[in-house]
A protein has these predicted regions:
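Acidic/polar loop patches that form or flank catalytic/metal-binding clefts of enzymes
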Residues: 1-3, 89-91, 151-152, 181
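Short acidic/His/Gly/Ser-rich catalytic and metal-binding motifs that mark active-site loops
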Residues: 103-106, 151-153
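Aromatic-lined, polymer-binding surfaces characteristic
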Residues: 104-111, 170
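Non-catalytic architectural context of zinc metalloproteases
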Residues: 1-89, 102-105, 132
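Short, flexible loop/turn elements at secondary-structure junctions
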Residues: 57-61, 96-100, 117-121, 162
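Zinc-dependent metallopeptidase catalytic helix centered on the HExxH motif
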Residues: 113-181
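Beta-sheet entry/capping signal
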Residues: 52, 90-95, 112-114, 133
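Short, solvent-exposed turn/loop segments enriched in Gly/Ser/Thr/Pro and often Arg
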Residues: 90-101, 146-148
């Protein structure tokens, strides 16, 4: 499994269980979890604020990530560092579900992103060209949309409605920066 949440210490006495350290409701809601039988984790950057790629797939063959793709993702992290100048997260995890059985989409979080893409996205370059730009888009959202939010999209609690008058601006900028990276 993978998530932005930190495991609690000490480890649970029951094998196969996980406990997480206490967090605020806001952090909990903003921390999706990815798990699966066919699972792989790759380091994209091992700095003090690391970036990790966590992948769950319908089939084990989909986890054979092409070295060129790993290199491109590592370059994405380096280029984002150059663009933004710092990392405002403790660590970041790309949570990627490779499946042709679920709806494909991306969802930003502050210290992770949930990315559902076609099962062959990492093994077929043509499919990857279509599917994988969502990773750059969601990574940019960590800065543009989570760390800094447009007026009206930052609310004091989950009961207050968001006003998305400027949503098109921040989504457009995020899309542009994702393509640049």
């Amino acid at each position: 499994f993978a998530t932005a949440l930190e495991a609690a210490a000490p480890a649970p006495a029951v094998p196969g269980t996980v406990r997480f350290a206490p967090v605020s409701l806001t952090t909990l809601v903003d921390s999706p979890l990815l798990a699966g039988r066919n699972f792989q984790r790759l380091s994209l950057d091992e700095s003090p604020r690391p970036v990790v790629l966590a992948v769950a797939a319908d089939g084990a063959a989909a986890l054979q990530i092409r070295p060129e793709t790993v290199k491109q993702l590592r370059n994405l992290v380096r280029e984002a560092d150059a663009l933004f100048g710092s990392r405002q997260f403790r660590r970041y995890t790309f949570l990627v579900a490779l499946s042709d059985q679920v709806t494909q989409f991306g969802l930003e979080s502050h210290e992770s992103s949930e990315n559902r893409v076609a099962e062959s996205s990492f093994t077929n370059p043509a499919v990857g060209m279509l599917e994988l730009p969502v990773l750059a888009h969601e990574y940019v959202h960590s800065w543009n949309g989570k760390y800094r939010r447009p007026d009206g999209l930052a609310t004091p609690d989950f009961q207050a409605p968001m006003r998305g008058d400027l949503l098109w601006v921040y989504e457009g900028l995020t899309q542009y920066l994702g393509q640049v990276l």
